[in-house]
Amino acid sequence: MKAVILAAGIASRLRPLTDTTPKCLLKIGERCLLERAFDALIQNGFDEFIIVTGYRQQQIVDFLQAHYPTQDITFIYNDRYESTNNIYSLWLTRSYTDGQEILLLDSDIVFDPQIVEKLLHSDKDDILALNRHELGAEEIKVIVDDAQKVVEISKVCSISYAIGESIDRKSVV
């Protein structure tokens, strides 16, 4: 299974921190967000990675090549990162993932490696890991029906109907 990591965004809400550094390379403690994600994925057996970059692409490429030189990493550049969102970045991966199982995640989330393990060992075809907390207007919200099937994933859906924020695994995109 391949890991698809979306890392194209500008993260303008974090300025001035992101004026010279992409959000995924910001450190929490001793390690940056992207390093934490890579370590968790490698710990769970991932050895193929697709990274969609945009803003400050070369910094991300340089970091990953320096820290993970033996990993199989495909870089895809979203040249429209200033005017598009994660859905477009994901769309750019289609020729690399067509019909294959993937684990999809944003590059700027902090998660326990055990979440990846639980996702991988699920008997479900398509699953999402959700963080249940009070949601703001900028979070991507998830709406489910009475049978717990996902019916909408969006920033614009009503917070009152959302059950959590997505940190996705989708088996076939």
Language model regions located:
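A generic "binding-loop/recognition-motif" signal
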Residues: 10, 21, 56
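Short beta-strand/turn micro-motifs composed of small residues
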Residues: 7, 53, 106, 130
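N-terminal nucleotide-binding beta1-loop-alpha1 segment
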Residues: 1-18
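Conserved core of the sugar-phosphate nucleotidyltransferase
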Residues: 112-173
